[in-house]
Structure formats: structure tokens, C-alpha cells
């Protein structure tokens, strides 16, 4: 499905900022090209979140008047289906993380990994596995502070 939203781009203190008119949040970039690319990435992540959790996307509005004196509007378009969200089975996530499938289930229960359902099957998002790999917590219990 295609998702189209209007963003306002304006100058912040150090970066150009892009805020969507119909959602909370936003993004930034060092120049106009980068802020447009970041707005596309931001919208993609928002749509993925809504698709994974069966949340409705807000109604898009167009022809909005910029809120900032130097603001200009851009249109951001993403094409995305729930089937295209990067994901792993629990077994694949376990292999990536170097743990057992049971440990992956524990990490999901502890909200350390994000999951979603697709066609009656539960999947682990690649983003949450990548984030966990980037953290690389050490094995065992944390040491007690003296």
C-alpha cells in the first residue's frame, strides 16, 4: 500500500527539521536532500510500527500552511506492506543472537525483542535483533557495585 503525507521542512538551531502535519514526531538533516531522505525513513518506520501492531494510520491532510516563517512543505511517499517488514523466525533470531530459541522467547517476554504476527505466525523484527546485537550485553549477571 502507498502512504502519502505532507511534512514541513524548516531551519532549526543546527539542522533542517522535518515535521509531519498529521503525526507527532519528526526528523532532521544537515541539508535539504538529507532531511528529505530522513523524512522518508521516519515515515517508513512509523508505517511499519502501525502495521506490526495493527494500529490505524492517521488521515493525511494536504495543502497545509507552514507553521514557521522559513517553512516549506514536502510530500513524502512510502510503499509498504506488512509482508515486507524485515523479520526473523524465533529460530533465525536465536542463531543471529547466539542464544537458544527459549532464550529468544524470554527476551520477547521481557520486551527486549519486538514481535508481530503475520499470517498466524509470530515473527521477531530484524530491527530489534540488530539493536540487541549492537548492545552486546555481557554474559552472566551484572556485578554488584561496592
Predicted regions located by residue number:
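A short, exposed loop/beta-hairpin motif centered on an aromatic-Gly-Thr core
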Residues: 22-34
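Arg/Lys-rich, glycine/proline-spaced intrinsically disordered segments
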Residues: 138-144
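Hydrophobic pocket/interface hotspot
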Residues: 18, 35, 104
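Short helix-start
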Residues: 113-138
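Short amphipathic alpha-helices within nucleic acid-binding modules
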Residues: 33-38, 130, 134
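Secondary-structure transition/turn motif
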Residues: 19-23, 127-129
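Short, charged, surface-exposed hinge/linker loops at domain edges
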Residues: 1-4, 38-109, 114-121, 145-146
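N-terminal segment of the canonical double-stranded RNA-binding domain
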Residues: 1-14, 19, 41
Amino acid at each position: 500500500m502507498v502512504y502519502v503525507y505532507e511534512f514541513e521542512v524548516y531551519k532549526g538551531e543546527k539542522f533542517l527539521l522535518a515535521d509531519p502535519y498529521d503525526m507527532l514526531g519528526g526528523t532532521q538533516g544537515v541539508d535539504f536532500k538529507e532531511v528529505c531522505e530522513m523524512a522518508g525513513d521516519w515515515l517508513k518506520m512509523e508505517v511499519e510500527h502501525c502495521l506490526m501492531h495493527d494500529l490505524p494510520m492517521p488521515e493525511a491532510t494536504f495543502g497545509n500552511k507552514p507553521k514557521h516563517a522559513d517553512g516549506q512543505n514536502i510530500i513524502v511517499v512510502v510503499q509498504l506492506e506488512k509482508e515486507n517488514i524485515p523479520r526473523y523466525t524465533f529460530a533465525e533470531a536465536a542463531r543471529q543472537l547466539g542464544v537458544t530459541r527459549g532464550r529468544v522467547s524470554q527476551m520477547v517476554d521481557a520486551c527486549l525483542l519486538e514481535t508481530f504476527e503475520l499470517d498466524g505466525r509470530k515473527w521477531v523484527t530484524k530491527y530489534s535483533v540488530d539493536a540487541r546485537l549492537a548492545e552486546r550485553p555481557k554474559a552472566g549477571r551484572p556485578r554488584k557495585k561496592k
